[in-house]
Amino acid sequence: MEPFKYICHYWGKSSKSLTKGNDIHLLIYHCLDVAAVADCWWDQSVVLQNTFCRNEMLSKQRVKAWLLFFIALHDIGKFDIRFQYKSAESWLKLNPATPSLNGPSTQMCRKFNHGAAGLYWFNQDSLSEQSLGDFFSFFDAAPHPYESWFPWVEAVTGHHGFILHSQDQDKSRWEMPASLASYAAQDKQAREEWISVLEALFLTPAGLSINDIPPDCSSLLAGFCSLADWLGSWTTTNTFLFNEDAPSDINALRTYFQDRQQDASRVLELSGLVSNKRCYEGVHALLDNGYQPRQLQVLVDALPVAPGLTVIEAPTGSGKTETALAYAWKLIDQQIADSVIFALPTQATANAMLTRMEASASHLFSSPNLILAHGNSRFNHLFQSIKSRAITEQGQEEAWVQCCQWLSQSNKKVFLGQIGVCTIDQVLISVLPVKHRFIRGLGIGRSVLIVDEVHAYDTYMNGLLEAVLKAQADVGGSVILLSATLPMKQKQKLLDTYGLHTDPVENNSAYPLINWRGVNGAQRFDLLAHPEQLPPRFSIQPEPICLADMLPDLTMLERMIAAANAGAQVCLICNLVDVAQVCYQRLKELNNTQVDIDLFHARFTLNDRREKENRVISNFGKNGKRNVGRILVATQVVEQSLDVDFDWLITQHCPADLLFQRLGRLHRHHRKYRPAGFEIPVATILLPDGEGYGRHEHIYSNVRVMWRTQQHIEELNGASLFFPDAYRQWLDSIYDDAEMDEPEWVGNGMDKFESAECEKRFKARKVLQWAEEYSLQDNDETILAVTRDGEMSLPLLPYVQTSSGKQLLDGQVYEDLSHEQQYEALALNRVNVPFTWKRSFSEVVDEDGLLWLEGKQNLDGWVWQGNSIVITYTGDEGMTRVIPANPK
């Protein structure tokens, strides 16, 4: 066969750092390196095969042929002199006969995007009047739907972060200047030659040609191609070595591609993307020694072995996590998924889940990569320990939970290991306008996505979550949603995202309950056939007390101190940080007996919050120190997934579903001994003494739900509240859309609430549309901005100006730190406060979204004096805002 005329004159990778060997890697070799990774990964994952072959009549062999063909075209935009002159030395080395021609300017090369240009050139070449023999001859035949190629080309050329669509592209931006016409002609011939070569390499052996119509393009292709490109660029001393020697013919290229399979297998192993799965052994394998499956756990083996959406409703502490994990294990064992992703509402709950998953990971995989992803995961000591273990003990028996360094380099890669634990916003990014969102989409698509505390999300976030569920359904993925209970309307909306059937959910009063919906139908599972596994019926004694602004009065505070003196573990849950701080201060003033009092909320630095969280778990956890009485004043941070246990709970009024979450921390664990007077679980609920809920409506704006919850509490009239009965009886009626007799102020409040909800739904739809048009940077500030409607916080950096520079709260001087240390110091010393505080400051936010606030250090801590407010910070109380009686 004749040597190649054009394609061997283009470089794909260039490096001056290699100490030996070539410093140029031919473009055609790089493209085949990437295709080799895709080929090897395909062979190792039945899940990926089934995903790409979903709803296709073509054989897997032919789908794979098209897949490799298009992936090898991912860098077609590099067949362009404007890219080649990014390393003019490399170009001239490969083209010694053309050094005298004037090349493109440095500025032109710097602005050149080979991904976007690749899509442009594919579009232009396809419309060209010049014929490319078999390849573009089909463009002359009007009936041929050549548009079927564009989704594939758009996906693979978008591998650097954002998928462009041909019809939306500014084509004038990529037109070749007339001064480069001679180069343009050669570039076009090279692209045509490369397409013909790829046809011979991949399509012809599968009985296909470029005149055939490819299958529908999977939404996972962009992520798959991007990952293959990352790994195919992983040049080491023994993988994907640079090579600038031109192949003699097509057979030499075929041999090169086959030889790269070993390199591909090696980098896949190094990356941590693949792992050996362990055979499913049942839910009992995940339980501690001596424990047997209970409640819904006994139903796992009966659940469908098929992709679907599963909604698990069960009481707090009933083993929902193990139920979900066992079902995920079962699906992985049957090659319906490759991995597991746990998404939780907060960083604290994600940290707690990481601890639980470390013990379970080795049951599912022989060498699992366990990854934690949220804005502060790099400061989680357990996660850092797991990462270090992978380095120091790789290959040894005790290294049974690994954390591949490559996977842990960024949050987006959490979705590529075997078990990922993250905050929910990391999942929502997969459908939002953020760079490389399709990497997250690929990871989710090949995983069982488990979303915990699904009741905790507002309308905006639920709108985004529904988009994630629909995307998962489109690729045949699986999702498990966990909640103590869900209102019927919300459950219906979630289930309707999956499959073609949208039959109404039967109003089944059974509890606990599993609803499953797949492509071909729906099933429901309960414990009616296993009455011995029904959760034990228990009661809580509500004690409603009406107080101004729902604030504990002197009598209540004194009762709390007396209870702690009697040995009780007492918790007061406040709806607002400011309220919690005031209550804490008043308790400290009244505490003459030195009862241990803690304050826990979200307005601490990361270091202080971590210390507070550990102290709370140590004192009030399952194995906490219960030798003396204590008091914890907290906000909502204790109501979600933290395993804490109190003898007496006092809580400000809140919606019923969240109230039940809080009550789940009361007598959470069976104990032989409770202090005298606290043998029966009593929950004191602070209600308003008049109409309306005041500032609490800023947090819980559904006034109707708040009012109906209050009515249910008051209607008990001293009777006990029985669980699990209340989950269904209360929530279904409280969240019922049907109107009932209610005061005028409730109706007025609902008008405002429904207007705000409508705006949130609109924002969710709008931001989902933006995902097709824009690409924002993948950083913490962007993630917060697009995933949490109206909840954007303001990161404050308190400091004291010294002669050496800015001294941060932990005592470090910012200017004395290295760049890496500065980055870490900013994360550890900032405090997130409500964004509304910004109007009190004249200081401006810097380019990283931080507001530096210069204050002074006194004996009590850091203090800043403004015109109308005083802000202080101590490790004990966190950041407080005080409005003086006589402001400046």
Swiss-Prot record:
Domain Helicase C-terminal: 556-735
Effect of residue 320 to L: Double R-loop formation. 2-4 fold decreased ATPase. No effect on R-loop formation
GO molecular function: 3'-5'-DNA exonuclease activity; ATP binding; DNA/RNA helicase activity; DNA/RNA hybrid annealing activity; double-stranded DNA binding; magnesium ion binding; RNA binding; RNA helicase activity
GO biological process: defense response to virus
SMART domains, alphabetized: DEXDc, HELICc
The enzyme's E.C. designation: 3.1.-.-, 3.6.4.-
Residues annotated as domain HD Cas3-type: 20-231
KO phenotype (gene knockout): Loss of plasmid silencing.
Impact upon substituting residue 74 to G: 75% R-loop formation
Effect recorded for residue 320 to N: Loss of CRISPR immunity to lambda DNA and of CRISPR-mediated plasmid curing. Nicks target plasmid DNA but does not degrade it
Source superkingdom: Bacteria
Effect on the protein of changing residue 78 to L: Less than 5% R-loop formation, binds DNA normally. 100-fold greater sensitivity to bacteriophage lambda. No effect on R-loop formation
Role of this protein: CRISPR (clustered regularly interspaced short palindromic repeat), is an adaptive immune system that provides protection against mobile genetic elements (viruses, transposable elements and conjugative plasmids). CRISPR clusters contain sequences complementary to antecedent mobile elements and target invading nucleic acids. CRISPR clusters are transcribed and processed into CRISPR RNA (crRNA). Cas3 plus Cascade participate in CRISPR interference, the third stage of CRISPR immunity. Acts as an endonuclease, a 3'-5'exonuclease, and an ATP-dependent dsDNA helicase. Anneals and unwinds R-loops (in which crRNA binds the target DNA, displacing the noncomplementary strand). Unwinding requires ATP, annealing does not. Required along with the Cascade complex for resistance to bacteriophage lambda infection as well as the ability to cure CRISPR-encoding high-copy number plasmid.
Family that this chain belongs to: In the N-terminal section; belongs to the CRISPR-associated nuclease Cas3-HD family.
Entry protein name: CRISPR-associated endonuclease/helicase Cas3
Protein's organism: Escherichia coli (strain K12)
Gene: ygcB
